[in-house]
């Protein structure tokens, strides 16, 4: 096994982070799609709860945007913090009837999901993520720039295909 093969071999930690991200994001992406595809009914139900139309639209955007962010591993930390705060707000605003066992259960679930999101925000997406792919591309571009700058500084011509560049 070469060093390159070892570097690309996913570790259990990364597979666990991927699985956790996908499971956590599923809830938000599904709910965001449900609200968006049944918008009229969702607007009516949310209005009855005192939620304005702009807040409903923001909720859908947050659930879909941050949900995909966490699931794909793109700006995962930001998406996880946003969804964690959303869960805390949802728990505090909508699940306050502690005498009702169902409401108490929803409060506890929202708090647990928020906790998971905050742990994910600290842990990051792991190696199996778009963040990793994009960071790798940025690092390669920086290395290419440094190589070109070093060649220019050394006075060596650069060649691109058959064309020689004099700088």
List each model region and its residues.
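Extended, low-polarity transmembrane helix blocks
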Residues: 1-37, 44, 53-65, 71-167
């Amino acid at each position: 096994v070469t060093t390159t093969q070892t570097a690309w071999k996913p570790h259990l930690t990364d597979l666990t982070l991927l699985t956790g991200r996908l499971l956590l994001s599923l809830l938000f992406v599904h709910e965001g799609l449900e609200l968006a595809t049944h918008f009229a009914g969702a607007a009516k139900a949310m209005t009855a709860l005192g939620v304005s139309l702009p807040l409903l639209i923001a909720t859908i955007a947050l659930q879909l945007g941050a949900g995909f962010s966490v699931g794909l591993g793109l700006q995962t930390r930001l998406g996880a913090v946003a969804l964690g705060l959303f869960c805390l707000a949802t728990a505090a605003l909508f699940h306050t009837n502690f005498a009702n066992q169902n409401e108490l259960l929803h409060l506890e679930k929202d708090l647990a999901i928020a906790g998971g999101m905050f742990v994910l925000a600290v842990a990051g997406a792991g190696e199996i993520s778009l963040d990793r792919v994009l960071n790798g591309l940025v690092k390669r571009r920086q290395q290419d720039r440094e190589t070109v700058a070093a060649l220019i500084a050394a006075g060596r011509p650069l060649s691109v295909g058959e064309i020689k560049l004099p700088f």
